[in-house]
């Protein structure tokens, strides 16, 4: 038996609504989002120069990402406010592509998933890197922000590998 996909934030008449999760049971949930920031060689060199940018830029982006995950429900109108148990932000430097790859992981034990929190954290980390490097490269590209993994709840485990 297959079901027709629907937009859960629209009611039968097409009006927006916040999904009612009050009847759901709390379950362990995790989501991982990924994205990248690509820049020119000059900006990448400044970012990765010892004692220069890497520590400050990436630490600032990490803190911004954690704050963004915690405030997700304030930014996305129909997103539920939920208790985050964990937010982790990891960066991988890719010298060949002059890129910073971002991974945001969020966990909760709640009635709804943490996909939006992970996606928001990843997005804000990328925006923070952009902001702090834009003086050296006006053409920085934020790309491939996506949900990579989610687990928990009725829909179970999902991967985008």
UniProtKB/Swiss-Prot annotation:
SUPFAM superfamilies: Molybdenum cofactor biosynthesis protein C, MoaC (SSF55040). Keywords: Lyase, Molybdenum cofactor biosynthesis. It catalyses: (8S)-3',8-cyclo-7,8-dihydroguanosine 5'-triphosphate = cyclic pyranopterin phosphate + diphosphate. CDD domains: MoaC_PE. It comes from the Bacteria. The active site is at 131. Substrate binds at residues 78-80, 116-117. Coiled coil: none annotated. Gene3D superfamilies: Molybdopterin cofactor biosynthesis C (MoaC) domain. Pathway: Cofactor biosynthesis; molybdopterin biosynthesis. GO terms for biological process: Mo-molybdopterin cofactor biosynthetic process. GO terms for molecular function: cyclic pyranopterin monophosphate synthase activity. Disulfide bonds: none annotated. It is an enzyme of class 4 (lyase). Homohexamer; trimer of dimers. PANTHER family: CYCLIC PYRANOPTERIN MONOPHOSPHATE SYNTHASE, MOLYBDOPTERIN COFACTOR SYNTHESIS PROTEIN A. Catalyzes the conversion of (8S)-3',8-cyclo-7,8-dihydroguanosine 5'-triphosphate to cyclic pyranopterin monophosphate (cPMP). This is Cyclic pyranopterin monophosphate synthase. It comes from Bordetella parapertussis (strain 12822 / ATCC BAA-587 / NCTC 13253). The gene is moaC.
